[in-house]
Amino acid sequence: MIQVRHASVSDRDTIVEFQVRLAKESEGLELDRAKVTQGVQAVFDRPHSGRYWVAQSGDKVVACLLTIPEWSDWRNGTVLWIHSLYVLPECRRRDVFR
């Protein structure tokens, strides 16, 4: 069974790994792991800038995403954008992101 929770700093290295894989798989880019680590840590250091979520199967994190708030004058409220979504290849098409 998949459980979704707010990510914690202890998930940082997994999130970094997933982001490095995402860039490689989707755009063929090799990211600087140190820079990605700083970027992920920045979200934990500045919670108003966004929030990471992880999906777990048992004790294993199998997916992550980042929600980023943005003010919408059209809606007179905050909307959330989904960024940096990654699901492990072996867990894709198994309703992890549903």
Regions found by a protein language model. Give the residues of each.
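Short amphipathic alpha-helical surface patches that serve as generic macromolecular interface elements
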Residues: 79, 97-98
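Acetyl-CoA-dependent GNAT
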Residues: 2, 6-77, 83, 88
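Conserved acetyl-CoA pyrophosphate-binding loop and the N-cap/start of the following alpha-helix
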Residues: 91-96
